From Swiss-Prot:
UniProt-listed PROSITE patterns: ATPASE_ALPHA_BETA
Full protein name: ATP synthase subunit beta
Task performed by this protein: Produces ATP from ADP in the presence of a proton gradient across the membrane. The catalytic sites are hosted primarily by the beta subunits.
Listed HAMAP family: ATP_synth_beta_bact
Residues where ATP binds: G153, G154, A155, G156, V157, G158, K159, T160
EC number: 7.1.2.2
Keyword tags: ATP synthesis, ATP-binding, Cell inner membrane, Cell membrane, CF(1), Hydrogen ion transport, Ion transport, Membrane, Nucleotide-binding, Translocase, Transport
Catalytic activity from the UniProt record: ATP + H2O + 4 H(+)(in) = ADP + phosphate + 5 H(+)(out)
Superkingdom of origin: Bacteria
UniProt enzyme class: translocase
Length: 474
């Protein structure tokens, strides 16, 4: 078969125009083209047809050093990456090349990063709770197996730490495979996460096939094309795990889905499309839908997705985070005000919600305790203005009691993390759902009204709080 060869006619930042002449067939949209820049393979993805013989492409690698007249080969297919067991314990880039210095990924199976979502008839509708061991999440905004969870928060409130704790808790307790897509985040954090996984045994360097996680990175320093596609590459690996061996439960982490949108906006501007609200791409909802609709459970296996979503300037009405809302089953909102109080995880118990916090799914007791906790916290929030102006003394006895309980609940929602042990020196805690419900039930019923607030800060179960109170009294 004769190769379809074109030549570069123009390079503007990450956009490359390639001309196909001499009866060459024009490559299809989304086809991967290859060229070699100082022996370095560069992959270009066809984005637009310009005229009869030119295609406009987005580069997946650095265009530095590309020159006009350089030969480009049409592969005839979209980007394909290795999938399956061979990817475990490895880090690859958007086009499936290893970036961990451990040699080629020897997989017998490769797969296109573009796939349709599963048919309706094959999708599963069952709902089971995924216990994370994190009190505030399990009680107030529980996650579902096969659900989509959004972690919302501004810069520096703890999204990545929470994701690392979820990988630690859920991957170990759950036993399935995990895929982590690093989309446009800090390279240092990606490196830290990799070494953290090696230290905790999630990645086994001696026998990579025994590892529990595959990593796909397209970090901040990569061109927008790579950042716009790396989430699809990660999802393709997650789908391969879900569908293998008659089905698996897979965890799919994306850090950060906002960077996926941001890269899409950059690509859109480079291609000359007219921007929509706040400068985002006109195809924002379509791009997000194509990714999110593939993250789903079938009758054989599930993909549970946790997506960190950076909120620009803490504005939840920004088109990027608000477009994500429509696809999520649960939202965990991280609050700067709570982080400023020193309460970690800084999850906002009133803003965070979940579709499965329903008595038919979680049970009557869990639902009742969660709603009582929220009611106490909401009352405290509404009283804060009065306290700020008039002070605590002006409150009724009933309101004083509510404030006291709310402050204890607020502190009891904090928890030491395993992945933060190295920073805090405090042993991490995994709290079972029954212990979480029992602890908060006792708090709202007033069983622990006599204990000091400090006893509830950074503990696991309620028994630990009681023990801490005894130590504080000494």
């Amino acid at each position: 078969m004769t190769q379809n060869i074109g030549k570069i006619t123009q390079v503007i930042s990450a956009v490359v125009d390639v001309k196909f002449t001499n009866n060459s067939k024009l490559p299809e949209i989304l086809n991967a083209l290859e060229c070699y820049n100082a022996k370095q393979r560069i992959v270009l993805e066809v984005a637009q047809h310009i005229g009869d013989d030119t295609v406009r492409c987005i580069s997946m690698g650095s265009t530095e050093g590309l020159i006009r007249g350089l030969e480009v080969i049409d592969t005839g297919n979209p980007i394909h990456i290795p999938v399956g067991i061979a990817t475990l314990g490895r880090i690859m880039n958007v086009v499936g090349e290893p970036i961990d210095g451990k040699g080629e990924i020897k997989s017998s199976t490769i797969s296109s990063i573009y796939k349709p979502a599963p048919d309706f008839i094959n999708q599963s509708t069952e709902r089971d709770i995924l216990v994370t061991g994190i009190k505030v999440v399990d009680l107030l905004a529980p996650y579902t197996k096969g659900g989509k969870i959004g972690l919302f928060g501004g810069a520096g409130v703890g999204k990545t730490v929470l994701i690392m704790e979820l990988i630690n808790n859920v991957a170990k307790a759950h036993g399935g495979y995990t895929v982590f897509a690093g989309v446009g985040e800090r390279t240092r954090e990606g490196n830290d996460l990799y070494h953290e996984m090696i230290a905790s045994g999630v990645i086994n360097l001696e026998a990579p096939e025994k590892s529990k996680v595959a990593l796909v990175y397209g970090q901040m320093n990569e061109p927008p094309g790579a950042r716009a596609r790396v989430a699809l590459s990660g999802l393709t690996i997650a789908e391969s795990f879900r569908d293998m061996n008659a089905g698996q439960d897979v965890l799919f982490f994306v850090d950060n889905i906002f960077r996926f949108t941001q890269a899409g906006a950059e690509v859109s501007a480079l291609l000359g499309r007219i921007p929509s609200a706040v400068g985002y791409q006109p195809t924002l909802a379509t791009d997000m839908g194509e990714l999110q609709e593939r993250i789903t459970s079938t009758k054989h296996g599930s993909i549970t997705s946790v997506q960190a979503i950076y909120v620009p300037a803490d504005d939840l009405t920004d088109p990027a985070p608000s477009t994500s809302f429509a696809h999520l089953d649960a939202t965990t909102v991280l609050s700067r005000q709570i982080a400023e109080l020193g309460i970690y995880p800084a999850v906002d118990p009133l803003d965070s919600n979940s579709q499965v916090l329903d008595p038919m799914i979680v049970g009557e007791e869990h639902y009742s305790v969660a709603r009582q906790v929220q009611q106490v916290l909401q009352t405290y929030k509404s009283l804060q203005d009065i306290i700020a102006i008039l002070g605590m003394d002006e409150l009724s006895e009933e309101d004083k009691l509510t404030v006291s309980r709310a402050r204890k609940i607020q502190r009891f929602l904090s928890q030491p993390f395993h992945v933060a042990e190295v920073f805090t020196g405090v042993e991490g805690k995994f709290v079972n759902l029954d212990d979480t419900i029992a602890g908060f039930k006792g708090l709202v019923e007033g069983k622990y009204d006599d204990l000091p607030e400090a006893a509830f800060y950074m503990v696991g179960t309620i028994d630990e709080a009681v023990e801490k109170a005894k130590i504080l009294k000494i």
